[in-house]
């Protein structure tokens, strides 16, 4: 796929989308080829610019996402003009999505390459990547910008081996009147101590993250990766700076470079400009040293895609045969009380409906998600098929709501003393339910029966409160969409 791109170079270089292109629908300007993966706030797709033939990356972001953060990312990319930072070409509104058109880096992220090859990087490879990354950070920091999420997953390589900084979803701008920021943003294992402690931080917070990234490239994962992220957040500020698991495997120059990055006091930590003069970085070899590992990773990815396609084709054939056998058989849907019927099938619901691209490669050490126990394993998407549920008439909902209200009111009147006091209905703060032992079975049953309608009422109040906050935001977005089609 990439060899075709090299044999057929773009007819001219795309620098920025012109006004004529930006007033068209994005499908008129681009052909979307495939999904590349997930970034902060949206999905990323590979596409081709029809006029020039240039490959680009398009991030599609739902407008329900944090629009302020999306606009911040666009603003930062617009202001940047560096070979070491991913370029921004333009943006579109399409239905409920914002399309952000960016530079395409064909080799993917450094973490993608490590996982595809199932190998960590050599010192020479790390030095070359760090040199380009430091040039990108030097540029950002000169512009008074902090990236705040430096890690191998946010360092992209093009097919020639040039490293570029990407994913500015959490980047921040420093001003003269706000020399240090006080917000905790980033990925836990890569966070600088001062970021976690919220004591204010500046551009050298990125340097700490770069030191952790250097260890990540050398060992395959950052320090503390084997413990819970919340525990790591407490350990990073209190423990001494992390080092290599086996320091004897690495040169003195590399060890010293990491040591210079991982200084706990930000005032004593080296800057990007200073680290570009470090012997480990100054002795870095050219980008040609990265071509072998890039080609190896792309070969692995291509083979996996071909294998997946064969499995899909085989499944399609099997499903086609099953559809022929099952056609015309109608059964009642499980839990369907309104008489709706559906076609019976031996296929399980949702089988083979989502192909997980290997180039997506979700990092196990990525952005922290709390309370994610309900997520399916191996990236499986859990689908809720609302079309199978029978529509409930509005009059039925009205009577059900009235019945719940009557139940709540009647409980307050009919239940005996122990239950009439509203304070008794609250969950005891100390978790002590001993008082229930003195109640009769009838009292307990009435209390149990009252919980469901009370819960429904509380949920409805929360829903209305959420809607009252959400609607003005949606109205503002709609107003902006009507006033302008693009940025």
Swiss-Prot record:
It comes from the Eukaryota. Residues 303-332 are annotated as: Disordered. The active site is at 149 (proton acceptor). The keyword Oxidoreductase does not apply. This is Serine/threonine-protein kinase 4. Stress-activated, pro-apoptotic kinase which, following caspase-cleavage, enters the nucleus and induces chromatin condensation followed by internucleosomal DNA fragmentation. Key component of the Hippo signaling pathway which plays a pivotal role in organ size control and tumor suppression by restricting proliferation and promoting apoptosis. One of its GO terms (molecular function) is ATP binding. Transmembrane segments: none annotated. Belongs to the protein kinase superfamily. STE Ser/Thr protein kinase family. STE20 subfamily. Residues 30-281 form the Protein kinase domain. Inhibited by the C-terminal non-catalytic region. Activated by caspase-cleavage. Full activation also requires homodimerization and autophosphorylation of Thr-183. Activated by RASSF1 which acts by preventing its dephosphorylation. The gene is STK4. GO terms for cellular component: cytoplasm; nucleus. Gene3D superfamilies: 1.10.287.4270, p53-like tetramerisation domain, Transferase(Phosphotransferase) domain 1. Autophosphorylated on serine and threonine residues. Phosphorylation at Thr-387 by PKB/AKT1, leads to inhibition of its: kinase activity, nuclear translocation and autophosphorylation at Thr-183. It also diminishes its cleavage by caspases and its ability to phosphorylate FOXO3. Residues 303-312 have a biased composition (Basic and acidic residues). It comes from Aotus nancymaae. The keyword S-adenosyl-L-methionine does not apply. The modification N-acetylmethionine is found at residue 1. One of its GO terms (biological process) is apoptotic process.
């Amino acid at each position: 796929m990439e060899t075709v791109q090299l044999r057929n170079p773009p007819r001219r270089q795309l620098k920025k989308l012109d006004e004529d292109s930006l007033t068209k629908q994005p499908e008129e300007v681009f052909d979307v080829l495939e999904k590349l993966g997930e970034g902060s706030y949206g999905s990323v797709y590979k596409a081709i610019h029809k006029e020039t033939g240039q490959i680009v990356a398009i991030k599609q972001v739902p407008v329900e996402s944090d629009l302020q953060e999306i606009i911040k990312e666009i603003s930062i990319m617009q202001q940047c003009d560096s070979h070491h930072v991913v370029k921004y070409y333009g943006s579109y509104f399409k239905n409920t999505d914002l399309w952000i058109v960016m530079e395409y880096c064909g080799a993917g992220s450094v973490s993608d390459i490590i996982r595809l090859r199932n190998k960590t990087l050599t010192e020479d490879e790390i030095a070359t990547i760090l040199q380009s990354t430091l040039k990108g950070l030097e540029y950002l920091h000169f512009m008074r910008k902090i990236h705040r999420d430096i890690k191998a997953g946010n360092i992209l390589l093009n097919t020639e081996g040039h490293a570029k900084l990407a994913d500015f979803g959490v980047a921040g701008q420093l001003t003269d009147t706000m020399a240090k920021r006080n917000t905790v943003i980033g990925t836990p294992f890569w966070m600088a101590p001062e970021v976690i402690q919220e004591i204010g931080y500046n551009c050298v917070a990125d340097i700490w993250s770069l030191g952790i990234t250097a260890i990540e490239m050398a060992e395959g994962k950052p320090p503390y990766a084997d413990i819970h992220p919340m525990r790591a957040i407490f350990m990073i500020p209190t423990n001494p700076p992390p080092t290599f698991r086996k320091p004897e495997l690495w040169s003195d120059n590399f060890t010293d470079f990491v040591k210079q990055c991982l200084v706990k006091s930000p005032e004593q930590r080296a800057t990007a400009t200073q680290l570009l003069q470090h012997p480990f970085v100054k002795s870095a070899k050219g980008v040609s040293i990265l071509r072998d590992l890039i080609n190896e990773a792309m070969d692995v990815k291509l083979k996996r895609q071909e294998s997946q396609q064969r499995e899909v084709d085989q499944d399609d054939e099997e499903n086609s045969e099953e559809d022929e056998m099952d056609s015309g058989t109608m059964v009642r849907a499980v839990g369907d009380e309104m008489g709706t019927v559906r076609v019976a099938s031996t296929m399980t619901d949702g089988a083979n409906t989502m192909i997980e691209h290997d180039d997506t490669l979700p990092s196990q050490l990525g952005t922290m998600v709390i309370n994610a126990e309900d997520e399916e394993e191996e990236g499986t998407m859990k689908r809720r098929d609302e079309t199978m549920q029978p529509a409930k008439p509005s009059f039925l909902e009205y009577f059900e709501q009235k019945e719940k209200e009557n139940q709540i009111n009647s409980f307050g009147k009919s239940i005996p003393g122990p239950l009439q006091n509203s304070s008794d209905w609250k969950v005891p703060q100390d978790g002590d339910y001993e008082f229930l032992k003195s109640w009769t079975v009838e009292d307990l049953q009435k209390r149990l029966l009252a919980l469901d309608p009370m819960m429904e009422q509380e949920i409805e109040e929360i829903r209305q409160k959420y809607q009252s906050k959400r609607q003005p935001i949606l109205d503002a977005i709609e107003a902006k969409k009507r006033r302008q089609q693009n940025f």
